[in-house]
Amino acid sequence: MKRTLLILLTGLLLCPAVAQIRQIDYSGIAPHPRLFLQKDAEKAIRKVIRSDKGLARAHFAIIDYSDKLLTEHCLVRPESGHILAISREALKRIFYLSYAYRITGMVRYAERAEKEMLNVCGFRDWDPEHFLDTAEMLLALAIGYDWLYDRLSPRTRDTVRTAIIEKGFEPTYDDRYNKFYGMNSNWNQVCNSGVICAALA
């Protein structure tokens, strides 16, 4: 009897919370892309590139690197050890390729970025024991997912979302991996930034 009463009371207490969840209005969330460069930011960038030599050099360096990536092999996760260098290279590749697509409109950059994203989603994990590695990977996928959203297939979107949740978010609930929450170093900022950007994407 006591157990039945406890279950009943718990259910009654949760009903308002469930009802509140159902009433969340998502219509106010900005459409993709919403991270760093919003829709139509490309026009302003193209204009600045024509008048600012320094920014033009940076732009063409990104395009050149993106062109080289088109024939590069995808990244490989080492069998052991940390993967920070791999995560940072994934971030660089996905960020540059996504930028190149948004500014030039050339589909080959988006297609290669999608290939890079699916590749890292296939890693067994993103080294949550050294959560900096995971955070960099989260940021990489957040940018690619958000900036290329309209170009990605529904299957790719689902794969990326699942990887972000399982390999990125779930470890943050595990005390073995979430020490960064209490750190006073840049780990706190970098790790939280990766998690937040992935959540916003």
Where are these regions (language model features)?
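Aromatic-lined, polymer-binding surfaces characteristic
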Residues: Y26, R34-R50, L55-I63, D67-A201
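General helical structural elements
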Residues: L6-I7, Q38
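Bacterial N-terminal signal peptides
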Residues: I7-P16
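Beta-rich carbohydrate-recognition and catalytic domains
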Residues: P31
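Positively charged n-region of N-terminal signal peptides that target proteins for export
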Residues: M1-T4
